[in-house]
Amino acid sequence: MIDENAPALFVADEQGRYHPTRYAIGPWDPRLLHGGATGGLVAHVLEMADPAPALQFTRLSIDLLRPVPLAPLTAEVKVVRTGTRLCVLSAELRHNDKTVVLAQALKLKPEAVTVPEHARPDWPLPADPETLSVTDLMGRALPPPDARRPSMHHA
């Protein structure tokens, strides 16, 4: 039995279907999923099927082909190309045999990069990220994390 109120965006069943929970509902229509939740599921299935764990994900392109319903989804991942320096994966999310999402991921071999002197900035590096203030999209300061209201998907 699927717990639709689990503290997760999706719950997988024994048949490999992903059942969205109430946390995955989008803001426009209660029958449809949020794009962020859908993107998270795509990233999850790509990571789980990863044939090249030594490579790093460097790009993820997601196409929402139609509205994604608040209903069980199936996922399929295919290896498009793999080698020692790169790997290309494709993912497809389906509902009732209709493709609702197509995605492609690129993984590359991590390598040390030396930045030449002429390409380095003349100004100092920014402060430690932990000391920087956090602002909203309009540039207004946000309260510290422990004083913030939880988002609607994490309430």
Please state what every model-predicted region is.
Residues M1-A155:
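Terminal targeting signals and extreme-terminal segments of soluble enzymes
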